[in-house]
Amino acid sequence: MDSSNRTRVSEFLLLGFVENKDLQPLIYGLFLSMYLVTVIGNISIIVAIISDPCLHTPMYFFLSNLSFVDICFISTTVPKMLVNIQTQNNVITYAGCITQIYFFLLFVELDNFLLTIMAYDRYVAICHPMHYTVIMNYKLCGFLVLVSWIVSVLHALFQSLMMLALPFCTHLEIPHYFCEPNQVIQLTCSDAFLNDLVIYFTLVLLATVPLAGIFYSYFKIVSSICAISSVHGKYKAFSTCASHLSVVSLFYCTGLGVYLSSAANNSSQASATASVMYTVVTPMVNPFIYSLRNKDVKSVLKKTLCEEVIRSPPSLLHFFLVLCHLPCFIFCY
């Protein structure tokens, strides 16, 4: 297309859930509540793991990292949407949009890699219990998390730079509540085939390889569990990875469901609604899944909350710590 028909983009319009103005207060309250529950729930998991030396193990080290990433993940999209609803202004700057895309991709990939590492951790714990502490030493745990960050940062940076190279036309409305990469690419006024090809190739590569690792880990885990003779032993072995399996299923099923629904349905509103499942709901329910299914986390949360309640004198910090543990504490009973 001729360069005269291109424009220097300064901002985009996030249409989000603006079709019905009467529902804006309800949507604002709902997303604010989910955001607060997510942040408080994941902070409570992190505080519980840090405060109890018994939880200073590889499994909980990875869980605390996952909770931190989930806080960052939901903070990438929801606060901007809440500000837009509050100010009745759906504008996001070009720089803000690219930045949002970068952090969105960064934390999605980190979630992906951390879930894979946690699957490997469960594989070693169940299939090689006698060598667990030797294999999953602190150096390896730190190295795996560091590599996950490096790969995720480079991938997000690469995808963002690909976005920067795209020329955009005058139609700059994004039918989403955040700068979803696929929606932004559709606004380009040039042939984006190469960009689409590269972006989808890297996404498929970075999604299928970790997923294959998870499948392999659980294949070996199931094989080991089936070889256990006692029913109690089978239940104990399975219970150690039940929470992780639930989170993995939720993360991949919701993410896959979004893109399948987008391909089958041309409704942008339906795509935006479906994406709420993996961008908001998944980070919100993760701490509750681990709290409900994990006796160690439940006991630490109860113990920490009780200590904060009886501690005196009351202060703002005291109130905040109690508030952080309250959601998971309620669901633990």
Swiss-Prot record:
Membrane spanning residue stretches: 26-50, 58-79, 101-120, 140-158, 197-219, 237-260, 273-292
Location of the protein in the cell: Cell membrane
GO molecular function: G protein-coupled receptor activity; olfactory receptor activity
Lineage top rank: taxon: Eukaryota
Record: glycosylation sites: N5
Topological domain ranges for the Extracellular compartment: 1-25, 80-100, 159-196, 261-272
Topology, Cytoplasmic side: 51-57, 121-139, 220-236, 293-333
Pfam families named in the record: 7tm_4 (PF13853)
Disulfide bonds: C97-C189
GO-annotated cellular components: plasma membrane
Function as written in the Swiss-Prot or TrEMBL entry: Odorant receptor.
Similarity annotation: Belongs to the G-protein coupled receptor 1 family.
Protein name: Olfactory receptor 1078
Organism annotation: Rattus norvegicus (Rat)
Lineage: Eukaryota, Metazoa, Chordata, Craniata, Vertebrata
